[in-house]
C-alpha cells in the first residue's frame, strides 16, 4: 500500500489552530532519506512516520524538515489521532516505540471524537546554566535579567527531547519576543540542546503561556510544543514554583498566540516526595486533509 499522508492540527479542536503535523501511514517501505525528503517537502515542524513494530502496537519516527528527532509531542498526538480515526478505535491503551523508548498512549473516545494522552519519559534536569551562557541566552531572546523570575534557574529539562526552561515575570510581553535566531543556534551547539522555552505563569492560576524557539533544527518557532510543556510541569514541581497537593499537579499550557495558532497542552505531573515522578500530556486534534503519495521513489 502506498504511504498515506495526513495534515493534522494538534493540541486544538479547531482547524487552523494549534500545531500542524504531517502523519504518514504505511511508511514501512520508505528509506531514511525518503522520510527526510517528505518531511522537508511537507514543511511541518515535525512529520510522524508510522511503521509496524514487533514490540509495540506501532513504531513512530519523527523528522523535522532537516533532521530526525527522538520524539515529538504534537506529532504523537496527531499520529494517534489519525490512527484511531482510521481504525475506528474506542477507549484503549496503545504502546508505541520511538527513538525515545517505549511509551504508553491512551486513546479516549469522547463526543464522536478523540483525546490523546501520552506518557512522557522520566523527567530529568541538567545543572543550571550560569554565567556567560545564561547571559547569552537572555541576550539572544532580547530580554534582560530583570525579565526573569528571581531565583528561577535557566535550565535544561527533559521528558524525552530536552528544552531550556526560562521563566519570565508575568508582566513581560511574551508575544513581543523577537529572538536572535543565529545566536540561539550557536548557543544550541554549545549546550547540546536545541529548544528554548520562555514561559510565564498566569497569576493565581495553574496556567502558563509559552513560546518555543528551535532554529538549530530548522524550527524558527514551534506553535504548541508537548515536549516543552511536559518538562515545564516537571520543572515547576522540581523547583517548587507552583503549588500542588503533594500527589499531582495539573497545568494548562497555552502556546501559539503570537502566531495566531493558539493551542493548549494539558499537563499532569504525578509527584512523590515533592519531586516529579511521571508526566503525561493530553490534547485534541483535527484532520484537515489527507492524500496518497502519487510518485514512486
Swiss-Prot record:
Pfam families: PhzC-PhzF. It comes from the Bacteria. GO terms for biological process: biosynthetic process. InterPro entries: Phenazine_PhzF-like. Keywords: Isomerase. GO terms for molecular function: isomerase activity. Its EC number is 5.1.-.-. NCBIfam families: PhzF_family, PRK10281.1. Homodimer and homotetramer. This is Uncharacterized isomerase YddE. It comes from Salmonella typhimurium (strain LT2 / SGSC1412 / ATCC 700720). The lineage of its organism: Bacteria, Pseudomonadati, Pseudomonadota, Gammaproteobacteria, Enterobacterales. The gene is yddE.
